[in-house]
């Protein structure tokens, strides 16, 4: 019985030692991963901030924003741009004139509206042709034309044309896509942060398990040592019992038998 108990204690001790060793390897691996957490989080944020800085530069150059967007307000800022406010229309005016009349001087809004109206009429004139046409007219003819085209109906038509061109421009499509890109980069940063937090949590759990397994291994070793001591004591007890039995037999043979002879 004692030998069976000793064998079981030995098996338990070996298993506890193997568990402790395995958890030691796991904690070492997780510690290596967690040592890179700060670098990963920082790198992800740097990538995101670089994208945001590029977006700010592009929108500023387009005249769509004056102040830099932040991660907390970029969505509302871009939504505001896409609602066709005065800043968007002003940027649209500059964009249209810049692309079709690169060398033109700075125009007032009323002149731009007039040029846009001329380009929007069904006369097969683009903006450049309309401006050249204005320059070639006799001053008195230009005065009459301006009076005609700056009527309320003409202004409304020019404004509607400008709204249509800005709203349907590639620039506005790019602005809408920019919002999606910034949202995706935020998801990327959040995912990296969640990963590193998960690694840290796993490492903390592994360390707790490792501490427990070390205590278990120490306990099973103590148990094994105790059973082994018991086994050795049982052997000594057996030897002592034999010796006692031999002594009693000898005492009986040499003492008691002679007395009762």
Residues covered by each model-derived region:
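Long, amphipathic alpha-helical coiled-coil
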Residues: 1-261
């Amino acid at each position: 019985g004692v030998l069976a108990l000793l064998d079981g204690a030995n098996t338990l001790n070996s298993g506890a030692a193997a568990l402790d060793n395995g958890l030691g390897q796991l904690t070492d691996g997780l510690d290596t991963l967690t040592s890179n957490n700060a670098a990963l989080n920082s790198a992800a944020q740097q990538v995101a901030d670089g994208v945001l800085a590029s977006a700010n530069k592009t929108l500023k150059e387009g005249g769509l924003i004056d102040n830099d967007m932040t991660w907390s307000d970029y969505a509302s800022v871009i939504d505001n741009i896409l609602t066709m406010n005065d800043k968007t229309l002003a940027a649209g005016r500059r964009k249209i004139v810049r692309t079709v009349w690169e060398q033109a001087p700075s125009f007032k809004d009323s002149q731009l509206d007039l040029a846009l109206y001329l380009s929007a009429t069904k006369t097969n004139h683009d903006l450049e042709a309309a401006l050249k046409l204005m320059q070639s007219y006799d001053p008195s003819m230009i005065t009459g034309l301006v009076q005609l085209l700056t009527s309320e109906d003409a202004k409304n038509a020019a404004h509607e044309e400008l709204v249509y061109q800005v709203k349907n421009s590639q620039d506005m499509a790019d602005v809408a896509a920019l919002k999606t890109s910034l949202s995706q980069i935020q998801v990327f940063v959040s995912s990296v942060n969640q990963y590193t937090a998960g690694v840290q949590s796993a490492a903390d759990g592994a360390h707790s398990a490792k501490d427990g397994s070390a205590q278990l291994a120490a306990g099973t070793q103590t148990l094994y040592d105790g059973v082994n001591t018991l086994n050795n004591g049982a052997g000594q007890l057996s030897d002592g019992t034999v010796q006692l039995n031999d002594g009693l037999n000898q005492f009986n043979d040499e003492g008691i038998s002679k007395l009762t002879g």
